[in-house]
């Protein structure tokens, strides 16, 4: 009945507010002087961007204060460079970017400082295998800033284009300009994602295969992780990963969050991850990045 629904809605609101207060209390308990924090890394989807695909005003103020304090900020994402640049331009950020979870790294001047991919033949072998399995999925292949997909009209590809504000090219692996494929993206029916992931890991153990949402699988060259990317950037800047802060919300962020001295999982992360990773911040719609940075005295 309407009265029951109103009661349920009120209960949910109270529960949500209580959860947020708990996270704020936990963060305040960690408050200390953090002169040893030298660099900040952040994932994009589900972390830096809120549910409207925007950076919240408070989080943006925190990022600008990082710039003012000359604390490096690094965007680290499974997205392509062209999927990250619109965010950088829109909000006037100055930062290095890590694309494809570490397969391609560019500095603040957008010079390539690291790149590694699989060959076109290797990528084609994976795709041939998935075709034989008749998995319910769409795929895209990425090389530097080229994104190829066999059917641009697939609604799953169209949705991905809208989210990342980048355009795919109709084509196949043979159409890729460079013989260096940094990532294969599989957009799966959520009910199939875990099955496809397990099957691919069993068939191709030499690659990094990781779930970045309940519908997305990312396949990169072996040894390509956000954690390894953090190590590379920290080494170039002569910074210990223990002096870094990182933010993420999904399975492809785990190694990074475990590596750094202060790794924060957003409270909108999957429940299984929240049980695995002990340090949390508020969710992407409640200034999770800004809350954690404030608690650590950075801003």
Question: What residue ranges belong to the model's regions?
Answer:
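Short active-site oxyanion
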Residues: 70-74, 93-95, 182-183, 242-244, ...
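Short, Lys/Arg-enriched N-terminal segments with co-localized hydrophobic residues
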Residues: 9-33
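Active-site phosphate-binding/coordination module
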Residues: 52-156
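Conserved acidic, metal-coordinating active-site core of Asp-based
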Residues: 129, 133-247, 251-259, 268
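Residue-level signal for inorganic ion chemistry
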Residues: 66, 77, 101, 184, ...
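Asp-based, Mg2+/Mn2+-dependent phosphohydrolase catalytic module
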Residues: 259, 264-299
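Asp-based phosphoryl-transfer active-site loop
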Residues: 36-51
């Amino acid at each position: 009945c309407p009265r029951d629904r109103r009661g349920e809605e009120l209960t949910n609101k109270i529960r949500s507010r209580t959860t947020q207060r708990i996270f704020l209390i936990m963060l305040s308990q960690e408050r200390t002087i953090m002169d040893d924090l030298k660099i900040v890394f952040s994932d994009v989807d589900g972390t830096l961007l809120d549910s409207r695909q925007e950076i919240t005003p408070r989080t943006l103020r925190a990022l600008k204060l990082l710039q003012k304090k000359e604390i490096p900020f690094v965007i680290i994402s499974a997205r392509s460079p062209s999927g990250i640049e619109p965010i950088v331009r829109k909000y006037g950020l100055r930062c290095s970017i890590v694309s494809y979870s570490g397969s391609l790294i560019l500095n603040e001047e957008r010079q390539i400082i690291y790149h590694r991919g699989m060959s076109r033949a290797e990528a084609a072998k994976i795709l041939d295998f998935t075709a034989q399995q008749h998995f319910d999925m769409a795929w895209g292949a990425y090389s530097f800033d080229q994104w190829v997909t066999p059917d641009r009209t697939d609604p799953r590809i169209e949705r991905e284009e809208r989210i990342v504000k980048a355009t795919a090219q109709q084509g196949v692996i043979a159409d890729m300009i460079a013989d260096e494929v940094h990532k294969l993206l599989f957009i799966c029916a959520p009910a199939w994602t875990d099955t496809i992931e397990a099957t691919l890991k069993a068939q191709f153990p030499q690659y990094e295969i990781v779930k970045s949402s309940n519908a997305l699988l990312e396949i990169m060259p072996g040894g390509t992780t956000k954690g390894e990317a953090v190590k590379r950037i920290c080494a170039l800047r002569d910074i210990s990963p223990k002096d870094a802060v990182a933010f993420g919300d999904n399975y492809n962020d785990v190694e990074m969050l475990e590596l750094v001295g202060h790794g924060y999982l957003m409270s909108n992360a999957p429940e299984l991850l929240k049980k695995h990773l002990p340090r949390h911040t508020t969710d992407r719609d409640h200034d999770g990045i800004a809350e954690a940075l404030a608690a650590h005295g950075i801003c």
